[in-house]
Structure formats: C-alpha cells, structure tokens
Amino acid sequence: MFNKKLYYMFVFTKLKVMENLNETTIQKVTFAPEAKEHYNEILTKEALDFLVQLHEKFNGKRLELLKRRVEQQSYFDKGNSPEFPIETASVRENNWTAAPLPEDLLDRRVEITGPVERKMIINALNSGAKVFMADFEDSNSPSWSNVMEGQQNLIDAINKTISFTNENGKKYQLNEQVATIIIRPRGLHLNDKNILIDGKEISGSLVDFGLYFFHNVKQLLSNKSGPYFYLPKLEHYMEARWWNEV
C-alpha cells in the first residue's frame, strides 16, 4: 500500500537534510585506515550528513540502553529472577491489537534469509519465497566491502537493475515476480569500526538502517512496498522504543 504520509515525510526530511548540509558536518566524519575505498555512490555528502544526524540524536540513548543491559545482567547474576515491569501492566491486562500489516507482508508463511551478497540476493528474491530477509547481522561478515557493497546490491535490487555474471559466464537477474525485502540491521551492541563521527565509532545499527532508508525509501514506496526491518536481539521494551523513535 502506497503510504503518502511516509512519502511526503521522507521528501521533507531529505530536503531538510540537504538544506542543512555543510562542510562542518561532513568534517565530523572520518574513516578507519581499513576503509580504503570510499564508495562514492553510497557515501554521498547527503547520506553522510544523514548518518551524522542519526548518530547525534540517537547514539547517546543507545549507549544508555547498553549500560542498562550490563546492570540487568549483574542483577540476574546475583540470583534475582526476571519480573514483568510494573509500568507495562496495562499492556498485559488490556485487550489490544497491532497495527494492520502492509499488503506485501500479509503472507509470510515461506521466508528465506541470507547475507547481502549480490548472487545471494538475486537467488533469494527469485526463490519463490514470499519474503527475503537481507541480513547485515549474523550471516554477514561486517567487513568494509561487505557492508558497502551490500548497500549497493540492495539499491540495485530495489530498482530491479541487479545482475550477476559468474566466472563461467552464467548470468543471474531478477524474475518479474520477486520476494518482499526485509532488512536485518546489526544489533544495538555492534559498532561499525570503519566510520567514526567526532572520533567515535558509529552504531552498526544506524549505519545499516540509515544508508538503506536514505537511498531506498522513495523507490520502495513507488514500488508499493516500504522500508521493512527485522530488529535482532532486543532485550527490553525500551530498546524497541528506541528503534521506534529512530
């Protein structure tokens, strides 16, 4: 279902980002020595500015949530048992339903998952499964090239221009009907050591989410789909709330 509200929110946000773009913001971003290739089509000035804004607005709270994980584990290590939070009693005691699902997520009986490697993406989208969960997390080694090329592969897939030719000359390309894409970004505890903002590593979660959302949301909505995310390894409702705010 085409979401006009989300589309106009994106257009406004992107225009605002471009309006606020300045060299001071970009100078906050540095790259680790291992990040030798820049990937200019992915790491545009506008995209980097978007990552900086995400980092400055949300990373502080993320670090607080990670600190809370340590404190919670210490509490359990002392022999205490988990308990339901008092402040969420109304959720447990009342009747409620989740918001309606988008049309292209109504049937998820057959899904496939794998890393964001180019051939894998093509085969997964052509597999006949209803959903492909493109994984930046466990199944993807987070090297600089894997992360950046994974983003480019997804851009090409969403624009339906992705193809791959192996060493024997066999060409892979998309069928007319393909699976719906869900992105699995890295967990909250994982940093991306290759991108630094003000000298500090950025959250891998924000890199995976930010670059994918920035480059693809307009085309996804045009495709009558949307930016869908599988959020791994959440340990508390406050962490889910953090993602909702992002």
Give the ranges of each region predicted by the language model.
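N-terminal flexible segment immediately upstream of the FAD-binding catalytic core
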Residues: 97-99
